[in-house]
């Protein structure tokens, strides 16, 4: 069922190891290598977003890969803006 009232942030969107043709939305220089759902949740909490987590879901174009999970972020911002902020926060946390 499609979730309403927010933006869906798949982990694939910010993963530097996934090519753009497979779903990455950020440039490779801004993306992070193999982000975990735990890191994304922590970054969203620190950024002050309200969200819902769906860990057992697979990104449809990569259904044959391992489970990625996604987060529904309750905001009207564009998904690229959210992805950029989350990836930046994850890079900051990994230092």
From Swiss-Prot:
Subcellular location: Cytoplasm
Single biological process term from Gene Ontology: SRP-dependent cotranslational protein targeting to membrane
GO molecular function, one term: 7S RNA binding
UniProtKB keywords: Cytoplasm, Ribonucleoprotein, RNA-binding, Signal recognition particle
Leader sequence residues: none
SUPFAM superfamilies: SRP19 (SSF69695)
Matching InterPro entries: Signal_recog_particle_SRP19 (IPR002778), SRP19-like_sf (IPR036521), SRP19_arc-type (IPR022938)
GO cellular component, as recorded: signal recognition particle
Entry's family note: Belongs to the SRP19 family.
Record note on quaternary structure: Part of the signal recognition particle protein translocation system, which is composed of SRP and FtsY. Archaeal SRP consists of a 7S RNA molecule of 300 nucleotides and two protein subunits: SRP54 and SRP19.
Function: Involved in targeting and insertion of nascent membrane proteins into the cytoplasmic membrane. Binds directly to 7S RNA and mediates binding of the 54 kDa subunit of the SRP.
Name of the molecule in the record: Signal recognition particle 19 kDa protein
Organism: Pyrobaculum aerophilum (strain ATCC 51768 / DSM 7523 / JCM 9630 / CIP 104966 / NBRC 100827 / IM2)
The organism's taxonomic lineage, starting at the top: Archaea, Thermoproteota, Thermoprotei, Thermoproteales, Thermoproteaceae
Gene that this sequence comes from: srp19
């Amino acid at each position: 069922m499609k979730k309403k009232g927010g933006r869906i942030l798949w982990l694939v969107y910010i993963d530097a190891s996934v090519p753009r043709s497979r779903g990455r939305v950020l440039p490779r220089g801004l993306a992070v290598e193999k982000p975990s759902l735990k890191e994304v949740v922590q970054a969203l909490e620190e950024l002050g977003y309200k969200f819902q987590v769906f860990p057992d879901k697979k990104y449809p174009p990569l259904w044959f890969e391992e489970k990625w999970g996604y987060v529904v972020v309750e905001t009207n911002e564009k998904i690229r803006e959210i992805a950029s902020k989350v990836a930046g926060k994850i890079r900051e946390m990994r230092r």
